[in-house]
């Protein structure tokens, strides 16, 4: 039988829960620094509210990234100097950096191994405070205390300076940051009425892959609570004293202040993806009459309410830290991309407008989003159970994106396609929400979009992913074409076997929506496609085995070989990827062999901490028996519940929670695997 997904969710959701009382501040359990030695650009952003656009954090290595991790890391807890504080942190989006300094003016951050060559400053971990909604640190080289907090669309900075005539604020706008890709243009102006305003145009790597020629633009409008004594512009290392504006790659601005001892200089910076004018509007609507301390309190209260929707009982203090820190990170992602007036960045580069209610407020918000690949193990259930209003917004936003571009996008950065792994589970997410009773969106349009995502191959752009879905629909599986490497075409894929498994699962999900809506012919087609995975089941090895373009199983099959037909994994890991038809998988393998194999998988994998061991590398576990450091088989510890030995699910879930997850900067979400 196939109807086990809800049970999987419950077992997965309760495995690591632990105790707290209603009186305890739940934010005290959150440690944003967990896992920050090997995380992505948007992972460490403590100065933010749930799903906010303004995500403020220090950056220690700009866009250089973690050589043994994934994309740009931004903040690496092993580093000892900070180059500034960025205001935008999102998947494939980053920039607008502010840095306080004292003394001789420098306009480039300098390298990690030589902080004195630029304006970056050393810091000590003991001087850091990172909490939900707040961050502070002492910049040792300058004796400046930096503090950050935020509303949804406004970043608040507060810098406490020593007594000096050379207190500086550096606005580094035209320099590459995070996952944003190369800067194509930038502009910053110190206006006559005392605002600092501008924009930066970037070309993220995934945008270049999935929507070539498109760019992402970030806008800002900032106000200060102190008057500078001097100002100037710069372009890289070249400075222009007294100038109020600069445009181009490397553009920036500096302001100089005469400060008394412990004088605070406050900065409010409104953000937008549509225009400077809307950044200014966001600033006025969200920050008018509010000071730093008030916003910090409000941010903390917002986090308390959000975290408090899930209260847990039993267990140890470290379990509570793991649980609420994980929940904190789940609520940070997929931040706002629309303004207070409902303006949003459309896929074609224009500015779209969300409908307004009778009071002139947008009827929903619009979001950036990392890919949904793997989010169906956790986020989609979390949203529907505890944050249904966000699920509503996310679905409404998907409908807008679909109408704008004609296809669903798995990952979206400023409305541009950033599919990530080149598949697309948005149709599954729409169907899942509908099946959970989340229906405050255009259901007919949602079904049309989901159906097209599962069945539509004609004219499919790269950004919509699933380029090989036509083959899956016509013959029930995607052919493995090893010559493609990591690419996918309409003829097949280098990841054909994992695609077949994934498309089978998503077809099943949309089939359930089709049946509920009375689309019986669609239901029958999708239900049949949901069994496509079985075409790849090899009765000899009892593993999922790729088939070539002629329909034959590939020769010289090695079930432990990673990337050979399987994206970020191997046949040993992916064979369990049949969450919609577990009973049939158990039947094909044989119940006793299934249980023995699965139990042995965990026994062996425990030696490598259920992943890639202690190697700091996002893909360290792709060759392993089991890789809890990546999405494809996060669910398999629950499968004993459907093979007659539920106590083994209890045993291995608890062991994974105790040993794979940690409360340290390196040992957090594994020892160095993919934190997503």
Where do the protein language model's features map onto the residues?
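C-terminal motif of bacterial Sec signal peptides marking the signal peptidase cleavage site
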Residues: 18-19
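Short, linear, compositionally biased motifs with a strong N-terminal bias
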Residues: 14-15
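Bacterial N-terminal signal peptides that target proteins for export
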Residues: 1-9
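Accessory carbohydrate-recognition regions in carbohydrate-active enzymes
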Residues: 22-428, 434-501, 508-535, 541-544, ...
């Amino acid at each position: 039988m196939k109807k086990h997904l809800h049970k999987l969710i419950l077992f997965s959701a309760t495995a690591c829960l632990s105790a707290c009382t209603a009186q305890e501040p739940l934010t005290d359990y959150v440690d944003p620094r967990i896992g920050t030695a090997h995380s992505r650009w948007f992972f460490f952003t403590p100065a933010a509210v749930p799903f906010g656009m303004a995500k403020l954090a220090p950056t220690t290595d700009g866009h250089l990234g973690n050589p043994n991790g994934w994309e740009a890391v931004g903040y690496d807890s092993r580093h000892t100097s900070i180059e500034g504080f960025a205001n935008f942190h999102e998947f494939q989006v980053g920039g607008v950096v502010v840095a306080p300094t004292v003394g001789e003016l420098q306009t480039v951050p300098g390298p990690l191994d030589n902080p004195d060559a630029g304006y970056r400053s050393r810091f000590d971990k003991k001087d850091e405070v990172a909490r939900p909604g707040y961050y502070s640190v002492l910049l040792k080289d300058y004796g400046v205390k930096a503090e950050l907090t935020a509303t949804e669309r406004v970043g608040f900075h507060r810098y406490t300076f020593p007594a000096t005539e050379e207190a500086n604020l550096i606005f580094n706008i035209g320099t590459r940051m995070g996952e944003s890709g190369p800067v194509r243009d930038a502009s910053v102006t110190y206006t006559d009425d005392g605002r600092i305003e501008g924009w930066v145009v970037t070309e993220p790597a995934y945008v270049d892959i999935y929507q070539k020629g498109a760019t992402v633009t970030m806008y800002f409008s900032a106000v200060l609570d102190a008057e500078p004594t001097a100002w100037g512009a710069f372009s890289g290392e070249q400075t222009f004293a007294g100038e109020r504006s600069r445009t181009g790659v490397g553009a920036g601005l500096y302001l100089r202040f005469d400060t008394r001892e412990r004088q605070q200089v406050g900065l409010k910076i409104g953000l937008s993806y549509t225009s400077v004018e809307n950044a200014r509007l966001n600033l006025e609507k969200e920050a008018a009459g509010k000071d730093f301390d008030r916003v910090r309190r409000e941010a903390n209260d917002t986090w308390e309410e959000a975290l408090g929707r899930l209260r847990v009982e039993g267990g140890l203090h470290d379990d509570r830290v793991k649980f609420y820190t994980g929940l904190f990170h789940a609520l940070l992602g997929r931040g706002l991309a629309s303004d207070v007036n409902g303006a949003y960045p459309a896929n074609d580069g224009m500015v779209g407008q969300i409908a307004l209610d009778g009071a002139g407020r947008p009827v929903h918000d619009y979001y950036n989003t990392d890919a949904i690949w793997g989010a169906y193990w956790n986020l989609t259930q979390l949203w529907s159970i505890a944050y249904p209003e966000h699920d509503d917004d996310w679905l409404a936003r998907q409908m807008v994106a679909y109408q704008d571009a004609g296809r669903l996008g798995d990952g979206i950065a400023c409305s541009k396609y950033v599919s990530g792994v080149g598949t697309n589970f948005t149709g599954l997410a729409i169907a899942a929400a509908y099946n959970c009773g989340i229906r405050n969106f255009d259901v007919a349009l949602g079904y049309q979009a989901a159906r097209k995502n599962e069945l539509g191959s004609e004219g499919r752009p790269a950004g919509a992913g699933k380029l090989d879905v036509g083959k899956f629909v016509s013959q029930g599986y995607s052919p493995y074409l090893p010559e493609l490497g990591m690419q996918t075409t309409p003829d097949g894929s280098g990841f054909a076997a994992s695609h077949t498994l994934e498309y089978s699962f998503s077809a099943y999900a949309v089939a359930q929506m089709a049946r509920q809506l009375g689309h019986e012919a669609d239901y029958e087609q999708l239900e049949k496609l949901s069994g496509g995975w079985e075409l790849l089941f090899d009765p000899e090895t009892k593993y999922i085995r790729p088939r070539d373009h002629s329909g034959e199983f590939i020769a010289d099959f090695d079930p432990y070989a990673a990337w050979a037909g399987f994206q970020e994994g191997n046949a040993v890991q992916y064979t369990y990827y049949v969450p919609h038809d577990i009973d049939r998988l158990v039947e094909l393998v044989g119940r006793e062999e299934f249980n023995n194999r699965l139990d042995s998988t965990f026994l062996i994998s425990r030696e490598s901490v259920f992943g890639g061991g202690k190697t700091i590398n996002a893909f360290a576990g792709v060759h392993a028996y089991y890789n809890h450091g990546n999405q494809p088989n996060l669910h398999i510890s629950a499968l004993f519940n459907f093979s007659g030995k539920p106590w083994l699910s209890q045993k291995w879930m608890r062991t994974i929670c105790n040993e794979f997850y940690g409360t340290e900067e390196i040992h957090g979400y594994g020892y160095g695997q993919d934190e997503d």
